[in-house]
């Protein structure tokens, strides 16, 4: 799987216990290996054991925005912002104060390359009305993780390029995403594009259903490589369906972040112009 370090916004969604954190961890490991910087907003302490970043905050101590920014000034440091010490009602305000600072750092340095927001429906609820300075329309390198995509602020959902769903009834999560955007649209605006109708999808362990909003294609299933701690080999990304290779893409370009192994039949993904493309290495 290849993630372009700029220009993509991803929604990772699924029911509780479906493997969202596992997939996010696998992606973050590859980002760390390729020296792309990230900042994880971690409301529940789910990433405390992640080895590629420094944790700021704990259940008895809230993190400091200044401390987060001081850490991210160092290009080789990733940050996990643990919000267990911040009251539930105060977390959206904390994040609203942190995001502009992250954007200022990006404007100066281009970093962090990715901002990962777990439990996004709590930090960015539907009632959130950000200003243009808090949430600029050109914001990219954003990964939202949530059980309830329809409970996330529409202004944030509108930035999403690609949806990755796991767990039971994954197509329902995509439907909830599209419905949330439709409810928020102004009169006269065109309807949000929806995925082509397909039969209900049953995913096996390790699989995800992926949909690109702008592709005009139906969602497709893909088996994802697990994190290092859950595999006995370097890992690979296996194609689920041999027909899921998009025309016009036959080689994986240099660069990007590989989430598959080097096996000859390995299928790979790459974000390109907001599209998650399936590529097969030859």
Stretch-by-stretch model annotation:
Residues 61, 170, 189, 264, ...:
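Intrinsic-disorder-associated interaction segments
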Residues 8, 17, 149, 170, ...:
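Short, glycine-/Ser/Thr-/acidic-enriched flexible segments
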Residues 11-13, 201-281:
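Conserved P-loop NTPase motor module
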Residues 64-67, 134, 172, 176, ...:
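Exposed alpha-helical structural elements
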Residues 19, 180, 224-228:
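Short intrinsically disordered coil segments
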Residues 141, 148-214:
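Conserved ATP-driven motor cores of ASCE-family P-loop NTPases powering translocation/secretion/packaging/pilus
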Residues 1-114, 124-143, 147-151, 156-159, ...:
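P-loop NTPase catalytic phosphate-binding loop
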Residues 119-121:
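Conserved phosphate-binding elements of NTP-dependent enzyme cores
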């Amino acid at each position: 799987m290849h993630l372009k370090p700029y220009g993509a916004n991803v929604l990772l969604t699924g029911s509780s216990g479906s493997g969202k954190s596992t997939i996010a961890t696998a992606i973050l490991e590859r980002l760390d290996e390729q020296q792309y910087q990230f900042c994880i907003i971690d409301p529940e302490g789910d990433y405390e054991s992640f080895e590629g970043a420094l944790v700021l905050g704990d259940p008895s101590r809230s993190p400091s925005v200044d401390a987060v920014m001081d850490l991210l000034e160092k290009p080789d440091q990733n940050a996990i912002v643990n919000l267990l010490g911040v009251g539930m009602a105060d977390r959206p305000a904390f994040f609203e104060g942190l995001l502009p600072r992250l954007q200022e750092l990006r404007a100066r340095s281009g970093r962090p390359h990715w901002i990962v927001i777990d439990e996004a429906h709590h930090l960015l609820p539907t009632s959130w009305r950000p200003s243009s300075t808090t949430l600029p329309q050109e914001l990219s390198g954003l990964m939202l993780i949530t059980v309830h995509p329809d409970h996330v602020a529409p202004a944030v959902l509108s930035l999403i390029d690609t949806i990755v769903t796991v767990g039971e009834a994954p197509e329902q999560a995509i439907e909830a995403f599209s419905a949330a955007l439709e409810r928020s649209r102004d009169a006269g605006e065109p309807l949000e594009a929806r995925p082509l109708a397909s039969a209900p999808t049953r995913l096996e362990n390790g699989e995800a259903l992926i949909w690109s909003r702008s592709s005009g294609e139906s969602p497709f299933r893909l088996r994802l490589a697990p994190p290092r701690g859950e595999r006995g080999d370097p890992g690979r990304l296996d194609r689920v369906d041999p027909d899921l290779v998009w025309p016009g893409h036959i080689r994986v370009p240099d660069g990007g972040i590989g989430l598959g192994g080097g096996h000859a039949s390995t299928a790979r993904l790459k974000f390109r112009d907001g599209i998650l493309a399936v590529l097969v290495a030859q």
